[in-house]
Amino acid sequence: MKKILFIISLFMFLTIKGQNDIKAEKLLNKISEKIDDAKSYQIEFTYTLENKLEGINQDLEGSVIINEDNYLLNFMGIKQICDSKNIYTIIDENEEVIISSVEDEGDQTIKPSQLLKFYRKGYLLIWDKLEINSNDRIQFIKLIPIDSNSEISHLLLGIDIDKNNISKLIEIGKNKTRTILNVKKIIYNPELNNNSFVFEKDNYKNYYIENL
């Protein structure tokens, strides 16, 4: 569950205050405009957890579809549906459904409308390295938390400057743990099924359903 919250929380933001690098701020504003123009989007990603001291190197695939305050997240074999009022966490392996209220989740749950927007609040922005691959050019922006008590040392946000898309997010913890989110694909304004964000209870008749 913590990993799911990490994936969601990776994308949260509003507006940043402080002495930001002008080039970094300008590039991120361009990305923000593209994100804000979309009514919905679909993201396929790879999540990697690394800690050399602990010998941890784990890769996991996932996807999320967002439409305003609704979302459908598939990650670690768990499906999470939010219909803007309730969050339904479906664990097929345990034949279990956990239902919680968006309102009750409070600050622990990031509003889907804020996904892909985490860099707008709480960070100092610094222009960083340019990574050139065979198929793309990724410009990294370094984000340093303003909160000195943060467990995060810094973030590296990779922007595909040819497609104006977020490509990669690297989080460096003060405990030397690295979490990497590689965005494999972003589709803006995808065609959505009317039931994409609807929890259909009849499909889970044999499941244990818990209301928090």
Regions found by a protein language model. Give the residues of each.
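Sec-dependent N-terminal signal peptides
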Residues: 4-13
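Extracytoplasmic
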Residues: 38-40, 59, 68, 82, ...
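Flexible, surface-exposed loop/linker segments and immediately adjacent secondary-structure boundaries
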Residues: 102-137
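N-terminal leader/targeting segments and the immediate start of mature chains
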Residues: 16-56, 69, 203, 208-212
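Gly/Pro-enriched, hydrophobic low-complexity segments
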Residues: 123-130, 134-204, 208-210
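A generic structural motif
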Residues: 46-52, 74, 90, 144-146, ...
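An acidic-aromatic
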Residues: 61-110, 179
